[in-house]
Amino acid sequence: MPLLIQQNVGGYTAFLNRSWEEFKVGFNDSSGNYWLGNELLHQLTVTNRYKLRFDLQSRANHSNHYTAEYSTFLVLSEQTNYMLHVSGYSGNAGYDALSHHNGLMFTTYDRDNDPWTYSRYNNNCAVYEGGGFWYKNCGYCRVNGARGVGGDFYWLSLPGGGLMQTSRMWLTCR
């Protein structure tokens, strides 16, 4: 049975300015936006083998739904800043956007671990994008981004310039 680990149903402010601690323990809001929590992601993925699936809805055409699946998904401990390991892409979402983030540490506005250097946003992709994630120069997969903030709520190669209406991330057993 799939386990929902992320849901962004509007891309406005649900993930905006969430702290390291909030992403660590998880959160939800009354609109249905949700993050399971990095610590639980770590505990789940180091003890079992999981696949990761994204369900994405394009903002350009709300009836178009896309999937991206990764046969390997692992989140390391907080001592590694919840480093991401992902591989084995398949799906109809076009370009393999998440593999660009493989091997990266999680970044939030108050704990900057991304290798970006752009002083306008304090060299921090979470500030620019509006939400925490595994960033590399802000990257190609911005499912925790906020609409109208920086690079927006985005998956490279989706129709309509990559902008999304909704995203969901699921864990399924391999």
Annotate each predicted stretch with a short phrase.
Residues L84-A126:
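A surface-exposed beta-alpha-beta supersecondary segment
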Residues M1-N102:
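Extracellular beta-rich globular recognition domains, centered on the fibrinogen C-terminal
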